[in-house]
Amino acid sequence: GNVGNSLALQVAEDPHAVYVIELSSFQLDNMYDFKADIAILLNITPDHLDRYNYEMQNYVDAKFRILQNQTVEDAFIFWNDDPIIAREIAKRHPEATLYPFAETHEAGVKGYTEDKKIRIETSNGTFTMEQDLLALSGTHNLYNSLASGIASKLVDIHDENLRASLSDFTGVEHRLEKVARVRGVDYINDSKATNVNSCWYALQSMTTPLVLILGGTDKGNDYSEIEELVKKKVHALIFLGVDNTKLHAFFDGKVPVIEDARSM
């Protein structure tokens, strides 16, 4: 996926009992014998539609290949409130044992928040932790913590190790990565946010006025998803795309300042 390290190289050089792999839809398209002991789908939103003939279902089918070959002995962890995932589960009836997570407690949910704590319930026991001790902020990182917490309990990670990891994890490069502060302005690199939904979560986590750089290659994006957050939080937009026509068509007149740029 986006991590960039070869799984085959990791296995060849330094074998471990457990491997955590990020798999892109591009990789899943060509995987047939692979089976995940624990598969995780955080959400599904439009992305890479230029690769999938601008048909959302084709992209969804690719993402759900992560469940191929799973049995009841395997686990499928997913966000319970994602409408596309819910629809596909009802249609596909996965063989894997289901471990949904949600922000609030619902019937059957294995990870949720309650009384300002995260709570994870599996056959290996119950784990709780104060929500304000999580190292990473934002709703998306709460979901990430719940999903990774369920997976950790399923492989029997000790509670003290899980708690330590969730409280001191520093994040990864290019994902809301704080690069520098210059004259009171924070510069944040979120270049891994390659779709509109990722941008929504980034904007949702911000608490100060923003200058937002948008660009790249349009992949069938629907910018209405971030329209209200842009109006509310963004002071200036800088377009850094191959073709900014669609960006201008949607955002012109909606923020005080809009500029085009050719490079960082």
Residue ranges and their predicted role:
Residues 1-6:
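Short beta-strand-centered segment that lines the nucleotide-binding/catalytic pocket of NTP-utilizing
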Residues 8-16, 37-187, 248, 256-260:
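Acidic, Mg2+-coordinating active-site environments of NTP-dependent enzymes
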Residues 18-26, 186-192:
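Switch II (G3) loop of P-loop NTPases
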Residues 33-43, 203, 207-212:
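Inter-motif core of Ras-like GTPase G domains
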Residues 153-158, 164, 168-172, 178-186, ...:
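ATP-dependent carboxylate-amine ligase
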